[in-house]
Amino acid sequence: MAEKENTKRNRREEILQALAQMLESSDGSQRITTAKLAANVGVSEAALYRHFPSKTRMFDSLIEFIEDSLMSRINLILQDEKETFNRLRLILLLVLGFAERNPGLTRIMTGHALMFEQDRLQGRINQLFERIEVQLRQVLREKKLRDGQGFIHDEALLATQLLAFCEGMLSRFVRSEFRYRPTQEFDARWPLIVAQLQ
């Protein structure tokens, strides 16, 4: 029984990995059908539906992976790091680095892969970025509590600016067919970002 569960779990993971790889390839710029996905995995469409009731559920599973990966690591950063600018830097690098290591998933994060899918999926991605923005805003607000001095500008405005930087780098990565890495020249950009905050 346990072996059958492992086989089913492995097949589910194989399907999700194939979908992510297709999103990374040139197929990712077009609608990915279950027929194409089944052919890529080497199974029938019926076999796909034994593991996932719909393509939407496949995307849901990938979004869940993105959410879990980013939010759990953001929580670790907040737990381990106390200095405001280090926290912000690490959160930005986390989002950019995750996208760089997972180009297919970046198409989901930018909404590019969801254009032909249910609106609810885009809503989940919107919520993810709102959660990241809330975390950035919280880090910015805590500076006043930690250091006794806040920022000149409103923390909500600054958090939006930081998130816009991330989203812009992800968009550039997808638009360039993954040529321009999101973390490329980050160390050179970071002082410019800090200057905007102060």
Swiss-Prot record:
Pfam families: SlmA-like_C (PF22276), TetR_N (PF00440)
Ranges in coiled-coil conformation: 119-144
Chief localisation class: cytoplasm
Single GO cellular component term: cytoplasm
DNA-binding positions: 33-52
Gene3D superfamilies: Tetracycline Repressor, domain 2 (1.10.357.10)
Keywords carried by this UniProt record: Cell cycle, Cell division, Coiled coil, Cytoplasm, DNA-binding
GO BP: cell division; negative regulation of division septum assembly
Molecular-function GO terms, alphabetical: DNA-binding transcription factor activity; transcription cis-regulatory region binding
Location(s), subcellular: Cytoplasm, Nucleoid
Family according to the record: Belongs to the nucleoid occlusion factor SlmA family.
Oligomeric and partner information: Homodimer. Interacts with FtsZ.
HAMAP family attached to this UniProt entry: NO_factor_SlmA (MF_01839)
UniProt function note: Required for nucleoid occlusion (NO) phenomenon, which prevents Z-ring formation and cell division over the nucleoid. Acts as a DNA-associated cell division inhibitor that binds simultaneously chromosomal DNA and FtsZ, and disrupts the assembly of FtsZ polymers. SlmA-DNA-binding sequences (SBS) are dispersed on non-Ter regions of the chromosome, preventing FtsZ polymerization at these regions.
Name of this chain's protein: Nucleoid occlusion factor SlmA
Protein source organism: Yersinia enterocolitica serotype O:8 / biotype 1B (strain NCTC 13174 / 8081)
Species lineage: Bacteria, Pseudomonadati, Pseudomonadota, Gammaproteobacteria, Enterobacterales
